[in-house]
Amino acid sequence: MIGLIQRVSEANVTVAGEVIGEIGKGMLVLLGVEKEDGDAEIEKLANKLCRYRMFSDEDGKMNLNIEQVGGEILVVSQFTLVADTQKGNRPGFSRGATPEHGEAIYKKFVHALRAKGMAVSTGEFGADMQVGLVNDGPVTFHFNV
């Protein structure tokens, strides 16, 4: 499971011209699901994101987590994160989960975040989405669990 996490002052996702998910201050999570991902990866990444200190304290140091700043999370599926880009001029997706498995893991991941008390908005799995964001910093982290 791969998560590309961006600290944002706002973010939204649009499908067919309609905003279907939006947040204020918080994190945008672009989530790529691999074939072998399951409950262990879901819990590991969800726990990491809830505890990760990527928000600035009063001294400007990254010492606060999402809960401490009252932030929100926008989760958007992005299968291209699992692409193999090592060979040739075209990405390979053999590591990626099937659409059925990917959607199930995506939904379980969102549920895991909500079960931890996080305010979560989402995109639409498998849809052609337009993602808008204001990256705060910019601050971006790559997690591979």
From Swiss-Prot:
GO MF annotation list: D-tyrosyl-tRNA(Tyr) deacylase activity; Gly-tRNA(Ala) deacylase activity; Ser(Gly)-tRNA(Ala) hydrolase activity; tRNA binding
EC numbers, comma separated: 3.1.1.96
Catalysed transformations (reactions): glycyl-tRNA(Ala) + H2O = tRNA(Ala) + glycine + H(+); a D-aminoacyl-tRNA + H2O = a tRNA + a D-alpha-amino acid + H(+)
Keywords: Cytoplasm, Hydrolase, RNA-binding, tRNA-binding
Gene3D superfamilies noted in UniProt: D-tyrosyl-tRNA(Tyr) deacylase
InterPro entries: Daa-tRNA_deacyls_DTD, DTD-like_sf
GO cellular component: cytoplasm
Protein's UniProt keywords contain Magnesium: no
Main location: cytoplasm
Keyword flag Transit peptide: no
SUPFAM superfamilies documented for this protein: DTD-like (SSF69500)
Comment on protein domains: A Gly-cisPro motif from one monomer fits into the active site of the other monomer to allow specific chiral rejection of L-amino acids.
Complex formation: Homodimer.
Function: An aminoacyl-tRNA editing enzyme that deacylates mischarged D-aminoacyl-tRNAs. Also deacylates mischarged glycyl-tRNA(Ala), protecting cells against glycine mischarging by AlaRS. Acts via tRNA-based rather than protein-based catalysis; rejects L-amino acids rather than detecting D-amino acids in the active site. By recycling D-aminoacyl-tRNA to D-amino acids and free tRNA molecules, this enzyme counteracts the toxicity associated with the formation of D-aminoacyl-tRNA entities in vivo and helps enforce protein L-homochirality.
Name of the featured protein: D-aminoacyl-tRNA deacylase
Name of the gene: dtd
